[in-house]
């Protein structure tokens, strides 16, 4: 049971004033307390203020002046008989999280009617914005206090998001409503912090929880593995013994997490058709590769924006020509008047019969052929004919609810190839939604045919749609590779937006449309200053681990106050700061260690 002994007292002075947003307290000398601890103060008119420790400092207050205040009696009650106010005091600045009404189960109608200004005893949602008065005793907040102040009881579909651990050893489960993650309130999750501070572990923990909690409605997860073996064991039990502290945190959160199930691993095709991967799972793995017929309509994903927008070499006109006339590229035809067909990458490299209005300079064609050849020579990913490997786009379109796809790109030899895979996945998902795979089944059938045929077709479509997920999550670590920061300055910003790569544009579509689609992005990187500002602008939940103050001083962290930045620079491994509009202030949480195997 929690000990609610006083730990401090509220006060005001010439230099320390209280407002509706913050107030100051004197800390009892022997009490240990830390930033992000929650405290409780009973205020006027049967109300309670819940606050968070934001700043701690030592100050000097003249004891003679202090004793003149009318709350000196409470000071004496707070201190032990052998303690006296010395020249120095520890004081804390408290940010107000919420003002709560103390619920009374006794109706006192007469007192309510006789005192017009008294808050009704049964009012639960009273808009209270009164500064905390001086001379009020302060205690650590209870679990119920914290949960109520953060608005968790009002959440219709709570998703466990971590545990607050206070200095007095009280642990508090923290939830996020599913609407904070998938919309319509907010969407997307981004984690940032220096390497080795478990930012990826937090995102995977949240994904495990979502996979478990949303299985009835249907959720599918696509994980892009960018770091060697990092995500290639997620369906395996961890080998280390699970610590009692981690078990306790799982119990507090009401979770019984197991490794991911329904996992399929997609590994890039390597030499002789074998997987090009740092680890080959025991089962449920497939290789993937790309025929020209798979991606003829998205070749721009292979090229940088500089290449496609270069006025001297109009590569984009060639790409558009291929897309519009595929596979009959030569409209003029051969001797027999039949168009020349392009079947594979080799044919495309050797094809030179583009119309003059498409290829105005021979150097443009040579540059195009050279760039395609660049991907063909060292790579085993772009094949003329697949034998055992699969096309990712086709597999994603067949993805059923509660399946987990791990797409390994870690050992692809170039960033361009990695980006192409990411872009192809994003474009496939964007096409799925634009074609209405999750729409009303009445829109999913061909209207041509008899009434019975249409009814049969609708019934088949409805059965297929029941297998489709309501929610889709895409996880990308090191997203700064694929959606990097643009130039600074107003003109530079406009230029960088127009010069985004085709891959970046597909990612941007996911970010912008996530709310309406229930299709969201979980992303991570070391530094927010390295990523496109659109990620920060469209992300609802920001997860921050340890960072240096120089990084924290950059513009992407403007939503964090200076005191919180100071705490972030001192975080230990496994500690996370959550920033979300649902919380009036950032909160510090921890999570249990992963239940699946880590390489």
Task: Identify the function of each model-found stretch.
Residues 1-194, 202, 206, 213-218, ...:
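Basic- and hydrophobic-enriched, low-structure N-terminal and domain-boundary segments
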Residues 184-189, 401-407:
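Pre-Walker A (Motif I) flank of P-loop NTPase domains
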Residues 218-222, 262, 401-404, 468-473, ...:
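Loop/turn-to-beta-strand initiation segments
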Residues 161-264, 504, 533:
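Glycine-rich phosphate-binding loop of nucleotide-binding enzymes
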Residues 573-599:
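Conserved P-loop NTPase motor module
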Residues 235-249, 489-494, 538-541, 560, ...:
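Short secondary-structure boundary/capping segments
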Residues 254-386:
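Helical/strand "switch-coupling" subdomains that flank nucleotide/phosphate-binding cores, especially
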Residues 413-563:
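Conserved P-loop NTPase motor cores
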């Amino acid at each position: 049971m929690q000990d609610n002994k006083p730990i401090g007292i509220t006060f005001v002075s010439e230099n320390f004033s209280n407002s509706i947003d913050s107030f100051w307290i004197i800390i009892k000398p022997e009490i240990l307390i830390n930033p992000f601890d929650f405290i409780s103060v009973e205020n006027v008119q049967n109300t309670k203020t819940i606050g968070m420790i934001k700043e701690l400092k030592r100050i000097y207050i003249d004891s003679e002046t202090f004793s003149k205040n009318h709350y000196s009696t409470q000071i004496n009650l707070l201190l032990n008989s052998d303690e006296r106010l010395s020249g120095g005091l520890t004081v804390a600045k408290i940010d107000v999280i919420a003002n709560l009404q103390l619920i009374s189960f006794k109706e006192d109608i007469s007192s309510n009617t006789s005192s017009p200004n008294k808050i009704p005893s049964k009012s639960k949602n009273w808009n209270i914005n009164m500064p905390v008065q001086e001379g009020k005793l302060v205690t650590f907040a209870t679990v119920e206090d914290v949960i109520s102040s953060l608005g968790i009881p009002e959440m219709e579909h709570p998703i466990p998001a971590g545990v607050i651990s206070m200095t007095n050893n009280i642990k508090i489960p923290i939830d996020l409503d599913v609407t904070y993650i998938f919309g319509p309130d907010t969407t997307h999750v981004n984690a940032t912090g220096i390497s080795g501070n478990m930012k990826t572990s937090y995102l995977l923990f949240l994904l495990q929880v979502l996979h478990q909690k949303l299985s009835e409605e249907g959720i599918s997860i696509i994980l892009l593995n960018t770091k060697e073996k990092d995500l290639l064991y997620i369906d395996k039990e961890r080998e280390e013994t699970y610590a009692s502290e981690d078990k306790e945190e799982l119990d507090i959160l009401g979770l019984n997490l197991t490794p991911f199930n329904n996992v399929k691993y997609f590994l890039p095709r390597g030499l002789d058709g074998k997987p090009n991967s740092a680890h080959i799972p025991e089962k449920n793995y497939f290789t993937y590769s790309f025929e020209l017929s798979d991606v003829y309509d998205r070749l721009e994903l292979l090229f940088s924006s500089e290449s496609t927008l270069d006025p001297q070499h109009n590569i984009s006109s060639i790409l558009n020509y291929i897309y519009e006339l595929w596979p009959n590229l030569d409209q003029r035809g051969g001797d027999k008047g039949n168009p020349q067909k392009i079947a594979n990458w080799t044919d495309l490299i050797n094809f030179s019969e583009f119309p003059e209005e498409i290829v105005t300079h021979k150097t443009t064609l040579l540059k195009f052929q050279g760039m395609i050849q660049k991907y063909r020579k060292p790579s085993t990913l772009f094949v003329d004919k697949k034998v055992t490997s699969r096309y990712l786009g086709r597999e994603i379109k067949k993805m059923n609810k509660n399946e987990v796809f791990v797409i390994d790109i870690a050992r692809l030899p170039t960033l361009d190839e990695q980006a192409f895979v990411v872009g192809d996945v994003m474009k496939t998902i964007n096409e799925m939604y634009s074609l209405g795979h999750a729409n009303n089944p009445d829109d999913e059938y061909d209207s041509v045919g008899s009434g019975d045929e249409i009814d049969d077709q609708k019934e088949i479509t409805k059965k297929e749609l029941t297998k489709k997920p309501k929610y889709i999550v895409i996880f990308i670590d090191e997203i700064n590779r694929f959606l990097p920061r643009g130039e600074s300055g107003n003109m530079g910003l406009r230029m960088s937006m127009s010069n985004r790569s085709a891959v970046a544009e597909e990612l941007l579509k996911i970010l912008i449309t996530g709310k309406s689609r229930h299709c969201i992005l979980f992303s991570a990187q070391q530094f927010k200053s390295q990523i496109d500002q659109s990620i920060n602008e469209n992300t609802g939940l920001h997860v921050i681990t340890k960072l240096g103050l120089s990084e924290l001083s950059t513009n992407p962290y403007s939503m964090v106050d200076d005191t919180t930045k100071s705490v972030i620079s001192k975080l230990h491994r496994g500690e996370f700061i959550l920033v979300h509009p649902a919380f009036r202030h950032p909160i510090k949480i921890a999570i249990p260690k992963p239940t699946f195997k880590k390489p």
